[in-house]
């Protein structure tokens, strides 16, 4: 899986928008109906729909509560202080990226938000890398459990995880083989 597929999956998450148009007809989708829309009345729609409406200037995107600078600072502090990965909202990085890219004028202090999200990603990436290194240093095979990993992180760590799996197979074969 790559970043584009992760964003595609995250695009089905619901987000609040304030429509600037009124339309009494709901939009019928496979996943369910969205709408009707009334100008100025907030409603929740999939992120991908919000981005399409935003591009047509038909709505204002309401950033999720966790996308506030103070909330992001709390998340960064939690990530820094905890040994493991902190629990994040579903599709945190993908939704952040899509909104910063496509709805930046609707995000308060967008540059600070972008910087904090990147800092959180970097901290988590460093933790994942150091965990993989520690796992590979072990002399015996065992299982690893990764809690609170985001889909995009698992996707980007796939090569490292595959290397760990192959290393485990090599170690197992070494212990199971008999000398000639």
Swiss-Prot record:
Its main location: nucleus. The keyword Transmembrane helix does not apply. One of its GO terms (biological process) is DNA replication. Keywords: DNA replication, Nucleus. The keyword Nucleus applies. Pfam families: PSF2_N, Sld5. One of its GO terms (cellular component) is GINS complex. InterPro entries: GINS_A, GINS_bundle-like_dom_sf, GINS_Psf2, PSF2_N. It comes from the Eukaryota. It is found in: Nucleus. Transmembrane segments: none annotated. Component of the GINS complex which is a heterotetramer of gins1, gins2, gins3 and gins4. PANTHER family: DNA REPLICATION COMPLEX GINS PROTEIN PSF2. Required for correct functioning of the GINS complex, a complex that plays an essential role in the initiation of DNA replication, and progression of DNA replication forks. GINS complex is a core component of CDC45-MCM-GINS (CMG) helicase, the molecular machine that unwinds template DNA during replication, and around which the replisome is built. Belongs to the GINS2/PSF2 family. This is Probable DNA replication complex GINS protein PSF2. It comes from Caenorhabditis elegans. The lineage of its organism: Eukaryota, Metazoa, Ecdysozoa, Nematoda, Chromadorea.
